[in-house]
């Protein structure tokens, strides 16, 4: 009896919560525009300011499938995941990650956004094909001379950035960086 009386209310509340959450959940665009603000032309660059506390930073930069890009990272403030500010080699955290060994409980490794990438690794993806386009900086080729990463995208869509962490725990992340993206061809 009680179940029948509250079922319509619960259904309405669940639907409303899903719609409202869809505005902010990574990769879900129920009420928003999925078109990026700009697409880079050949040899054109764009800079964005990235905070590690953002679980899904939509850059408004459109990537074109089959095109090659260069990604340069300049860290402005020290990166930290809660109390972890150094990797296993006692070096300051950067876009490259830290090992699961530094987590207080090893099982937490199963909760990070991408289990095939390390903690706090800078991740990139495109909005229209989030699974196929998901890459960590460890997947990209690194050019020591220019201190930048190169990659080719396999689909078109808006560039989204985040560090590999547990969803819901981005608020304890600290740090910022300038991300420069250049389309090479």
Stretch-by-stretch model annotation:
Residues 2-11:
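Bacterial N-terminal signal peptides that target proteins for export
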Residues 20-22:
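C-terminal motif of bacterial Sec signal peptides marking the signal peptidase cleavage site
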Residues 27-185:
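Gly-Asp-aromatic-enriched flexible segments
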């Amino acid at each position: 009896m009680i179940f029948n009386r509250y079922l319509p209310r619960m259904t309405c509340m669940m639907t409303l919560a899903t719609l409202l959450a869809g505005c902010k959940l990574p990769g879900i665009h129920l009420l928003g525009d999925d078109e990026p603000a700009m697409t880079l032309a050949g040899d054109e660059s764009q800079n964005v300011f990235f905070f590690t506390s953002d679980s899904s930073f939509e850059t408004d930069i459109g990537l074109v499938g089959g095109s090659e890009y260069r990604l340069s990272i300049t860290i402005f403030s020290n990166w930290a995941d809660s109390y972890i500010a150094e990797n296993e080699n006692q070096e300051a955290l950067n876009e490259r990650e830290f090992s699961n060994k530094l987590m207080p409980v090893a099982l937490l490794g199963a909760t990070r956004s991408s289990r095939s990438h390390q903690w706090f690794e800078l991740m990139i993806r495109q909005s229209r094909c989030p699974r196929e386009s998901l890459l960590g900086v460890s997947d990209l080729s690194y050019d020591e001379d220019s201190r930048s990463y190169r990659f080719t995208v396999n689909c078109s869509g808006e560039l989204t950035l985040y560090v590999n962490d547990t969803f819901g725990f981005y608020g304890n992340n600290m740090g910022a960086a300038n991300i420069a993206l250049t389309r090479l061809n």
